[in-house]
């Protein structure tokens, strides 16, 4: 969103100097320096920093002679919600034979929700392994084929099969596609009726170490304020380390290394683990207008 605003601001400078209408790099850099300064406090929605940002953008629009597009305003109000998660200390996983283990937060797993509620979670949700959690018809790929994940917790590998195999003929090889993104995987799991999804973290495939999702999960989540959120947002989203995922699958009698390798082959089918997981997340919820 800020990139679009910066582009608009730079174009304003072009309009203001119509004798040389080329896109001015110096103006773009100037606006970046201003908006990224400490004075704008991070520009988060619903904060004083956002108000300063909006005032600056509006000032630049007026200086360029642009006409307001929404009545006498340049701005459109958007209802948003800020959700600050406070996850339980552990996810409790139990097998069919009574074998249990704990996957602890934040060293093994991190979770959050975009449901604007004081608390949510899963209880005795069946754990399902879904390969990369991808449905990509143009690549002839469907990790959910024949797999019922309704009301269940899905485990899915980060990135896509092309990266794992380095095969340029599989997806786009080393270059990650949209299907490799974690937010896509959450959306796909939701479309299939899952209660939650944990992305299995691997530093090279993700492009960043575990510290990134671990630290990110302790920060507020911002989302549009929507109706029918239970149908439009997972109860739980999050990440799990490779080691923790391996322990869960091992408790189910499954070999994670073998599963991971098989997941990159065309025609792979996910599987139910027979394990059941419980975990909850408590939230501080604040509604705002951005």
Locate the predicted segments by residue.
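N-terminal hydrophobic or amphipathic helices/low-complexity stretches enriched
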Residues: 16-69, 244-245, 251
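Extracellular/luminal Protease-associated
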Residues: 24, 104-236
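Active-site-adjacent bridging/hinge elements
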Residues: 28-32, 163-165, 265-271
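Hydrophobic alpha-helical scaffolding
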Residues: 21, 43, 47, 175, ...
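NTP/phosphate- and nucleic-acid-binding module
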Residues: 20, 180-181, 277-279
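Bacterial N-terminal signal peptides
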Residues: 3-14
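Long, well-ordered, tryptophan-enriched scaffold segments
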Residues: 191-204, 208, 214-289
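Noncatalytic luminal/extracellular "stalk/propeptide" segments of secretory-pathway proteins
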Residues: 41-168, 273-276, 280-290
């Amino acid at each position: 969103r800020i990139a679009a605003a910066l582009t608009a601001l730079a174009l304003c400078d072009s309009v203001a100097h119509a004798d040389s209408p080329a896109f001015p790099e110096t103006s773009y850099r100037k606006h970046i320096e201003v908006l990224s300064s400490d004075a704008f406090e991070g520009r988060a929605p619903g904060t004083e920093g956002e108000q300063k940002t909006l005032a600056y953008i509006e000032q630049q629009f007026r200086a360029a002679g642009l006409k307001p597009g929404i009545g006498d305003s340049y701005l459109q109000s958007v209802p948003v919600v800020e959700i600050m998660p406070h996850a339980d200390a552990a996810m409790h996983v139990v097998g069919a034979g009574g074998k249990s283990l704990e996957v602890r937060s934040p060293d093994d797993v991190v979770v959050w929700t975009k449901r604007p509620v004081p608390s949510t979670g899963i209880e005795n949700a069946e754990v399902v392994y879904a390969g990369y959690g991808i449905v990509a018809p143009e690549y002839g790929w469907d990790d959910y084929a024949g797999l019922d994940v309704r009301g269940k917790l899905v485990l899915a590998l980060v990135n896509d099969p092309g990266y794992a195999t380095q095969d340029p003929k599989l997806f786009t090889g080393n270059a990650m596609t949209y299907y490799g993104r974690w937010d896509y995987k959450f959306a796909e799991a939701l479309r299939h009726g899952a209660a939650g999804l944990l992305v299995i973290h691997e530093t090279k495939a993700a492009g960043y170490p575990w510290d990134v999702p671990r630290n990110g999960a302790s920060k507020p989540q911002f989302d549009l304020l929507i109706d029918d959120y239970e149908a439009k947002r997972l109860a739980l989203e999050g990440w799990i380390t490779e080691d923790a995922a391996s322990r869960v699958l091992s408790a189910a009698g499954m070999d994670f290394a073998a599963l991971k390798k098989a997941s990159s082959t065309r025609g792979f089918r996910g599987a139910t683990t027979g394990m059941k997981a419980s975990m909850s997340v408590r939230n501080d919820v604040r509604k705002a207008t951005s």
